[in-house]
Amino acid sequence: MFLGLNVSSAKVAASYLRTQNFDVEGPDPGSLMKEGETKPPPPQWYSVGTADKPAPNKQGFSVPIFLIEYPSGDWYDKARKEGRTEHPNTAIDIHAVWFAVHDVKSQLRTLRDAGFEADESRDVKLLGAHGRVLKAGSGAMILLESSDKSSVLQKYLSGHDEGIIALSVEVSDLRKAQSMAESVTGGKMDTYKGTYGKSFLLSPDATHGVWLEMFQR
């Protein structure tokens, strides 16, 4: 699972990363062909990433992220008109993405070089982890390392590469989202006062592998 971060210019982002000694791949154009189309449409996005194995003396992202530019906003307007941006659980957007890492300080150095700004510290007792928040537009990336060898986060890292362990999704109607989640899972979801507002939590067993926090401001 990867996090794609929307940027205003893939070209400018790639140029900046190169000045910071990153082994950059892209900008690479991409598009989707609809059924029946025989000719690829013009590029609908441009993506920028770093090499999986950076060249000697070069940097690369070791958490699963990439940058993406959508040259035109027409796709979103069309999707909204077709109702494809509306969700039965009233989800508005993914506000925060939580990454399980071995060494927060090391990741912070790399991501600061990439232009991200570090924010507050964060302790997550449920995962037995602590770390730092990084600002990402109107949302956040949260880097977490294990606080003890038997923690939930440490168990995750024993079977995975560094990656996304949890998401915080904002909803417009928490009660409706909670009712829908309880109906689908067959279990009761208790609410709590979370970092971003009143929240409830879905376990990885119900979400194909990640903790999913839903909250309402």
Role assignments for model-derived ranges:
Residues 1-120, 127-217:
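Glyoxalase I/VOC metalloenzyme domain signal
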